[in-house]
Each structure stands twice: as structure tokens, then as C-alpha cells.
Design a protein with these regions (language model features):
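Hinge/cleft segment of the Venus flytrap/periplasmic-binding protein
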Residues: 83-84, 99, 187-232
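Hydrophobic alpha-helical segments within soluble ligand-binding/sensing domains
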Residues: 45-71, 171, 186-204
Length: 232
């Protein structure tokens, strides 16, 4: 028998079906990483995706120089319209909210990258950077900023500012090398710990649980990344 379930809801329809089953069987469940509000979990533990996008823009645009005519690039997933990409869309919404407030005349490009076809990505990026030499600032809203960072390194190119999400090994290596300038960490270990604790408090100790517990939005650079992992 199952008393409680901790879920990272990456897939909309599957998550809704699981949530309906758990509700019918009176089994408590909590979400980490992404909140799917209509599934009515006991609690959500993770970042505010919209705010993290807003902050990402604010950090990235510190590198902006209007006098150089710099242009901004949104590197988006080819699955961006998939319901599983809702978290990325919320980050994008927050990011663009800050840009709209502060940089009305900024030239913005969108480049679609394929999750699994690096050869196609290379061709896309080669053509884009040849056509847009002033594209100096970039953002990736998922964990695959390494795709872009590795391309820049191998192509002998660089950007004035590049920000992405998640502390995958490949991302961290590129942060340390300077090919990626910022990573936003989400403390997945702490999310899991808080999720289990909330379920235990509810199921075992009959305590009330907050419906939302937001994690800090951590900005990592090459100078502080080595001090971070002990506390993730």
C-alpha cells in the first residue's frame, strides 16, 4: 500500500491521470520542480518559474551595451508548444516582462534548437550567427544550455552574456570555462527533502502543510559555483 507520492510533473496528461487516481484513493501527493495547479496537489515545492525568468533577464541585461547595438537571442526548444514545456513558457513570460519594462527598442531573435539533433542545431546556429553578428546576449530556458555553450566553444564564438538553468555536469563545466556566464540553480535535493517532509507532516503527524513553498532562485557564476554544491 502507498501512503503518499512525491511527483515531478513533467507530462501534463499523465500527471492529471495519476492525480485523479490518487484523489480517488485518498492518497496524498506533492509536487516538486513544477506546479500544475489544476492537479490540486497537497503542496508544491520549487521555484516561482515566472519570477525566475524575470530575474534571469535582469541579470543577463547587466551585460547590455546600447552603444554597441547588441541584440538578444531567445534559444527555444522545438517542443516549446508541448504541455510538458509549461514551466519553460512561464520562465519566458517572466523574462519578457522585464524586457518589456526596461528595453522597448531591443532587437530580439528566436532560435529553435532540437533536443536530440545536434547536427541540425549546428547548421541552424552557423546560419544564425553569420546573419546576425550583433547577437551578443542569449538565454536558454531549459537545462540544455550546454548545447549552445558547446557549439560556441567548438565554433570559436562567444557571447557577451549567456544564461541557462540547472546544474548539469556539462552546464557547470561550461560555466567554469566562461562559455556560459550564469546558471540558475533550483536545489533539487532540497526540493525533494521538503516534499518528503511535507508529506510526512501531513500523513504521519497530521500537521497542516503550506500549499506552496517557493525555493530560492540561486544565481551561479564561475566564481561561486564551487561553494554551492554542499548546500544543494
Amino acid at each position: 500500500n502507498v501512503d503518499a507520492v512525491l511527483i515531478s510533473p513533467n507530462f501534463r496528461e499523465e500527471t492529471l491521470a495519476l492525480a485523479a487516481y490518487l484523489q480517488e484513493n485518498k492518497i496524498a501527493y506533492a509536487f516538486v520542480d513544477f506546479n500544475m495547479e489544476e492537479a490540486r496537489a497537497l503542496t508544491y515545492i520549487g521555484q516561482d518559474s515566472y519570477k525566475s525568468g524575470y530575474i534571469a533577464a535582469k541579470i543577463l541585461m547587466r551585460n547590455y551595451s546600447a552603444g554597441e547595438g547588441q541584440e538578444l537571442v531567445l534559444f527555444l526548444s522545438n517542443n516549446k508548444d508541448n504541455p510538458a514545456e509549461i514551466q519553460m513558457q512561464r520562465r519566458l513570460d517572466g523574462f519578457m516582462s522585464y524586457i518589456a519594462e526596461e528595453y522597448n527598442n531591443l532587437v530580439i531573435h528566436e532560435v529553435i534548437l532540437n533536443k536530440s539533433d545536434q547536427e541540425s542545431n549546428q547548421q541552424t546556429l552557423d546560419e544564425f550567427f553569420r546573419a546576425h553578428p550583433k547577437a551578443a546576449l542569449g538565454v536558454v530556458f531549459n537545462s540544455r544550455v550546454y548545447q549552445l555553450g558547446e557549439y560556441l566553444r567548438h565554433a570559436g564564438r562567444s557571447m557577451k552574456g549567456l544564461i541557462g538553468y540547472d546544474l548539469l555536469k556539462a552546464n557547470v563545466e561550461l560555466l567554469k570555462s566562461g562559455d556560459v556566464h550564469y546558471l540558475i540553480g533550483q536545489r533539487p535535493g532540497l526540493q525533494g527533502y521538503c516534499g518528503v517532509k511535507a508529506l510526512c507532516d501531513h500523513v504521519v503527524f497530521k500537521k497542516s502543510v503550506e500549499p506552496v513553498k517557493y525555493m530560492p532562485i540561486d544565481i551561479l557564476i564561475k566564481e561561486n559555483i564551487d561553494f554551492y554544491f554542499e548546500f544543494v
